[in-house]
From Swiss-Prot:
Entries under Gene3D superfamilies matching the protein: 3.30.1440.10
Signal sequence interval, chain numbering: none
Subunit structure, interactors included: Part of the 50S ribosomal subunit; part of the 5S rRNA/L5/L18/L25 subcomplex. Contacts the 5S rRNA and the P site tRNA. Forms a bridge to the 30S subunit in the 70S ribosome.
InterPro entries for this protein: Ribosomal_uL5, Ribosomal_uL5_bac-type, Ribosomal_uL5_C, Ribosomal_uL5_CS, Ribosomal_uL5_dom_sf, Ribosomal_uL5_N
PROSITE patterns assigned to the protein according to its UniProt record, in alphabetical order: RIBOSOMAL_L5 (PS00358)
Domain of life of the source: Bacteria
PANTHER family: 60S RIBOSOMAL PROTEIN L11-RELATED
SUPFAM superfamilies: RL5-like (SSF55282)
GO biological process per UniProt: translation
One Gene Ontology term of the molecular function aspect: rRNA binding
Membrane-spanning intervals of the chain: none
Native source organism of the sequence: Cereibacter sphaeroides (strain ATCC 17029 / ATH 2.4.9) (Rhodobacter sphaeroides)
Claim: Ribosomal protein is one of the keywords in the record: yes
Protein name per its UniProtKB record: Large ribosomal subunit protein uL5
Gene from which this protein is expressed: rplE
């Protein structure tokens, strides 16, 4: 049986061994606590068809839970909007917030397995930073992850992936993600 106590995710070990030193050298940080690190990864699925069929949110939450390895939380409408036929507290999507080892494991699977399986993939956009060191991207189909069985998927759903870092600028965050081998186009 595998001993779980000594296990460290691959990207977490890489951060401790090589990424921190490279970032400190590149940006000239005086203190180790200034070095940017990953804070959390938020996965979000908005289910537009949930207005007509609320069961679709449940299946989306199950798929997101399989992808993340953690139970997804169903998100609800804050207020009613008649034009969209949305009522207050109606389930509209689901989300998962990953931290710690699960965050590093997910990022590893995203970079090495899921992104190369995206159709016509050349890389991710390098300009999707928010100005405060957080990176946002979207996937159009959930079955690029190996946890999702293609035959059991009823409907193709996309997802938003937000990678939050402690970096102060976009350049620092981009350098951090490049150290983790994130395939940026520019």
């Amino acid at each position: 049986m595998l001993d779980q106590t000594n296990y460290t995710p691959r990207l977490k070990a890489a951060y401790a061994n090589t990424v921190r030193a490279a970032m400190k050298e590149e940006f000239g940080y005086k203190n180790d606590m200034q070095i940017p690190r990953l804070d959390k990864i938020v996965l979000n699925m908005g289910v537009g068809e949930a207005v007509k069929d609320t069961k679709k949110v449940k299946t989306a939450a199950e798929e997101l839970s399989m992808i993340a390895g953690q139970k997804a939380v169903v998100t609800h409408a804050k207020k009613s909007i008649a034009g969209f036929r949305v009522r207050e507290q109606m389930p509209l999507g689901c989300k998962v917030t990953l931290r710690g080892d699960r965050m590093y494991e997910f990022l590893d699977r995203l970079i090495t397995i899921a992104l190369p399986r995206v159709r016509d993939f050349r890389g991710v956009k390098g300009n999707s930073f928010d100005g405060r060191g957080n990176y946002a991207m979207g996937l159009k189909e959930q079955f690029v992850f190996p946890e999702i069985n293609f035959d059991k998927v009823d409907e193709v759903l996309g997802m938003d992936i937000i990678i939050c870092t402690t970096a102060k600028t976009d350049a620092e965050a981009k350098a951090l993600l490049k150290q983790f081998n994130m395939p940026f186009i520019s």
